[in-house]
Every structure is written in C-alpha cells, then in structure tokens.
Amino acid sequence: MDGILGVENFNTSLAEGVMLLTPFSATSEDEKSQAFVKAYEDANKDEVPNQFAADTYDVIYAMKAAADAAEITPDMSNEDISAAMSEAMLSVELDGLTGKAKWTEDGECDKEPKAFEIQDGAYVEME
C-alpha cells in the first residue's frame, strides 16, 4: 500500500482508515526525514518520496559504511570486494531515514517497521 496515495488519479478516500506497516513516511516530522523530503521534492518536480526512495537513500550509506569497514581499495578484484563487503555488512548498524537497521548472517536487513493509518489522504503515524 505504500505509495498508493501518490498514484495518479487515485481516489484517496478509498484508502481512508487503511493501516499499514512501512519504515518511512514523507509526513514524518523528524528533521532528517523532512530534509530528505525537501531535497527529493526539489530534485523531482515536487514528487513526494515514498518508502522505496528512502530505502534507496539509506542503502547507499549502508554500502559506504561496509566499504569503509572492509577497507575497499580500487586495486581489489571484484571477487575480493564482494567477499569483503559481504563480511563487513554483518557489522554495519545504520540509523537512517527508515530506522535503525542491521544485517543478519544470511544478509537480510533487520529493522523495526512503523505503523501508519491513512487519515484525510495522509499517512499518520500510530503509537
């Protein structure tokens, strides 16, 4: 359901009261999210970012943290970079737009979702 409110010609009243889990909402009031939303809208003709834009933003920082931890150098082979990054990702802990994230031994991202309800055509965070 994330992003449904931004679908062209979608009647947002049809989503009224829908509850969903998503790690990000452009209506979040924290400073980091609002700075991201403003920069995204400025760069994308006022398009509002959804969870997937925020996930993409966060993953770049996670990859940078892993590359730094793995001490990646330009002279390393692709195979060596891949092995070093895979190992380093297990130690990365990121506090990003989509929340606090870490990675499991099998490479899955582990983070807490946030609960939202659609009210008056907007995502409202639930307690």
Map each language-model feature to its residues.
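Extracytosolic ligand-binding ectodomains
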Residues: M1-E127
